[in-house]
Amino acid sequence: MKTSTIPTLLGPDGMTSLREYAGYHGGGSGFGGQLRAWNPPGESVDAALLPNFTRGNARADDLVRNNGYAANAIQLHQDHIVGSFFRLSHRPSWRYLGIGEEEARAFSREVEAAWKEFAEDDCCCIDVERKRTFTMMIREGVAMHAFNGELFVQATWDTSSSRLFRTQFRMVSPKRISNPNNTGDSRNCRAGVQINDSGAALGYYVSEDGYPGWMPQKWTWIPSELPGGRASFIHVFEPVEDGQTRGANVFYSVMEQMKMLDTLQNTQLQSAIVKAMYAATIESELDTQSAMDFILGANSQEQRERLTGWIGEIAAYYAAAPVRLGGAKVPHLMPGDSLNLQTAQDTDNGYSVFEQSLLRYIAAGLGVSYEQLSRNYAQMSYSTARASANESWAHFMGRRKFVASRQASQMFLCWLEEAIVRRVVTLPSKARFSFQEARSAWGNCDWIGSGRMAIDGLKEVQEAVMLIEAGLSTYEKECAKRGDDYQEIFAQQVRETMERREAGLKPPAWAAAAFESGLRQSTEEEKSDSRAA
């Protein structure tokens, strides 16, 4: 008895079963089998990152040090996220703390004044190494996060009694965080980070600076926080999934392209130099066999004499009748020689278009616009430039919120705790919670960095004015977009107005015109209202 076979339904290609063809193609062999050899393993982020972690960061370091585009990408992050001054805008959660809004504002003014004196001291007392102000530390942290994927800051205590505040900070390179004695990873110790069963960091193993290399390497274990809740070691990175222990640098997705672009540029430059090096060549009628006899057979005395004699004859001839290209003399060559002029060839040969394509790919991977990365703003309209700047601005604002502000806020909390203990600033007496009970509420703050790039200053100002007049924005938000604090702007305007009045100066013409226009409009509205009544 014959067993009947059920026919298999095939897809449009006539080879793949219809069941497989109707599913997600990404998990199959693809059309024509293009994906059949693509079988990446399914790994956790630590399994994919940590085995080659040191080498990947070393390559990123090399790119930033020796590649102009990579260095520019880091500079863009520093300039657009932090800028020249990272300004504190302290705003405690006064409703939660049970204090009045005016009390909270008065407390914030005291805190901001004391913090600025401590953080931006020219003597750099905030830094253990006495090299950085607070803004410089934030800029370094942003750069560190950009090309290493994470940043580390150690909160320390100055034992000397020469200064009011003892709180200090040390920037720690990610290269110094590693397992003791370079041992392998374990379940609770990965890449220098000791974690609990839930994945929370308990402490970090920090090695001493190994330079110049002959000194024995030592590791120190530093807890992530002290028993009282004070941060001891600040670690900031953006995890992409659960269980991630260390941060991945942003260059991983474009590292190969950046390195190949660097090699391509060097090769293109060498090619251009070689093509421009020779204006003309003199070709001799000496055949290949004779030339090889001269060159390869020069070990014998006879061949050396023949080669020396031949070169001597040529040198003597052209010494008596030199060949010149820049003069008016028409050269008369040695019999059998020919002069060939080398025309300059196009050294580009489609290279610029190919370079732009690579740079667009790299810019997309780094989160910046092509124009900012390449510094090429040619052939751009205002709308195109504005759209490109807004895309990058959204990326930079995310990094400011989750990287720079997190680092700054944790450093600020360490200082604020000491400032309260030393009574440099005094908590409102009617507060519901103490500092230890509500650290986040007392230390809640925003950070104002560099302003958004203005493509057209006039249009940017008009937009801000219209948003405020329409009630869709506030002076605080619009000033923050420009990198300014609205309270400082208002206070300065009041001082300038009073000084101009005392000096007998009239208000600016535009201010007077705006005031008269507003007064005229208000009068007309009142008249129309009275008529309607």
For each predicted feature, which ranges?
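Short, Φ-rich (hydrophobic/aromatic) sequence segments
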Residues: 67-98, 137-146, 251-271, 280, ...
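N-terminal-proximal low-complexity accessory segments that begin disordered
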Residues: 1-101, 531-533
